[in-house]
Amino acid sequence: MYTGLLHTHRTVAYLFLLATVALILLAIFRRISGTSSTDSKQALLAKIALISGHTQLLLGLGLYFLGPWFEQLTSNTAEVMKTAELRWFAVEHIGANLVGIVLLTIGNSKFKKAADGQSKDKAVLVYFGLGLLLIASRIPWDRLF
């Protein structure tokens, strides 16, 4: 079960990264070109980014509580905190990604409530951008590919 969750978690990561990067690039392009109309592509990308991000969170929580990190953390916290790799997975990876998903959720709410295209683009650039930056800083890139 753990292996299946891990493979699904890695696969959904690609969808999340693709949708979020595309959404941010679209917002940048719209800001540069001065386009202020609302775009259904932008709303679809925001929805895909949010859903895949939340799916990643749920899969990650499943991996966290079913995997070796949580077991080691609960049995020997001091040793986990001393070991860089264990601390990274047990604390830093999950903490940063949780905050990143919260930023995406806030950004999606502001995106949906925004009255005009510029406000939507600003919500995407600020919240989705910061969320992606935070999440990307804690992705185990050596294990993703």
Residue spans of the language-model regions?
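Membrane-embedded alpha-helical bundles that constitute the cytochrome b-like, heme-associated redox core
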Residues: 1-145
